[in-house]
Amino acid sequence: MAILRPSVVSPTRPTVKTEVVYARGMESIVLFGPPGAGKGTQAQRIMDSTGLPQVSTGDMLRAAVSAGTTTGIEAKKYMDAGQLVPDQVIIDLIKDRIKEPDAKNGVMFDGFPRTVPQAEALADITTVSHVISIEVPDERIVDRICGRYTCAGCGAVYHESFKPTSKDGICDSCGGDEFKRRADDNAETVMSRLEAYHNQTSPLADWYESKGIFHVINGDRAIDLITNDILDALK
């Protein structure tokens, strides 16, 4: 079982449970979430609370290619040809990663698996004890992403509704007055990405739900409340 260690209570903010200690041997977590759901923020908090390292297959692929490992050389052939890297290559990378000392109690997978066959292959090499799905209504995702803009000078990130500049048109960090938006931060592109995400993850969610380890977390709330629900699910 997992032992939860609470943090000091804050008089103005929800109590954030700060540490989950695993006592069950090597078990891993899978983290789902559409773009704009705040998955990156929660991933960092899960790592801080559980001690499990985050495993991103994209990062692992790039590192393996850069290092010129056997698996990296194999992956590069497909990447250079503009093809998807086969599942077995990804699984080989994961096998190597979970042998590292920091993964002795498990890892947190981010961005993998994406398909049921990948989930089945993953189950052959590590025990997935919890699957966390951070869910936010599509219209809220569109608002979050399309309202983002950054300072052209220092890269500080703002949002029209949630985090505007203190002084209209002036960056709080550097005082610059030029801002930019990502070209793909528009409603049409975001909705297309969300549709692809839902189509991809729906069968996978059903598969994990059938295992009794799938946890839906309401991501349309305060960050601390989301974190607490995730850590409760990991007990």
Explain the meaning of each model-derived region.
Residues 1-235:
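Glycine-rich phosphate-binding loop of ATP-dependent small-molecule kinases
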